[in-house]
Amino acid sequence: MRPSHRVLTVTCALLLATAWLSSTAGASEPLSDFNATFQSLAVNSKGEALVTYQRADGKVRHLLAWGAVNANAPTDQAVPQVHFKYDYSGGWGKYHKSSYWSSFANKCAPYDGPALPYVVAGCKAPDGSYWAIQSWQRALPLLGFDPWKPQQTAFELHLSHWSGELPKLEVYGHWTYGGAWQGLFGRLTYGGSPVHGFGATGDGNPLDRYGRNVYIDTFNSVYGAGWKRESGILVHKPTGTFCHSFVPQKPFPGYPSQETRPAAPGERYRVTVMGPGVTPVIQWEGAGLTAADRQAAASVTAIWDQVMTGDGKCAPER
């Protein structure tokens, strides 16, 4: 096949909690105010961001965020991943000034950084770093199921802050299991180092701020027209790699049906992941495979051998 890989970006620091006092939160902890309507992003000369949005109940919230940029590499589990501190009262928790947000001096210049998917706002801080807000439906059900719970359709607001190099998401399409099925494999790195966590639940949810899941969508497949969520996969330790084959699968417990879902290769694929620390979510998109791509199978296998070295979990899909 003709391998392609493209690096884009989105955000990765999610907003949490409803506390009045200052709190800390990891970059991958979702905001409790789902489906909020973004209003403004401001950044002052002290490195604080003020995010103003309207909650679904109509109430306006002024969120103060500070204390984090970029990400740490997962070299030592004892070293915490970077994360924002939040004051959901707009300054009362940090400064005991109820009007702090109203006199916030915005010094952020127009955004001139890399293109971001799902972006609703971005700007360039006085120190040259970037801040961004994006809105994303991360909780869609897997295996192409239509949402059946309100929270599955929720839009999350994500805040990010970074300078310099962005995370890199490599994704390649290939034929798996002797050419019977289409699949994707790839690797998530930051600053040349693999991104991974140190622990996860049995169903693949990270147990620390280092771990990340990639979310795979398929376009115009047997699931129906448009984009449908196929899978969510934990990136592997210590390689930062992942793989997925579009094969028939049995739905998860609690899904509306337990009938085996058909293989769902699509015309296009999309892979999205929240970057490490407070870096942006990044996204790759590429074309599905065709019969002509089989002629390049050997070259893609060579890429697999280079990218997936050390990943024993994915070896059967080589």
Regions found by a protein language model. Give the residues of each.
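C-terminal segment of classical bacterial N-terminal signal peptides
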Residues: A17-A25
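N-terminal export/targeting leaders of redox proteins
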Residues: T11-C12, W20
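Extracellular, repeat-based ectodomains that mediate carbohydrate processing or recognition
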Residues: G26-R318
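Bacterial N-terminal signal peptides that target proteins for export
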Residues: M1-T11
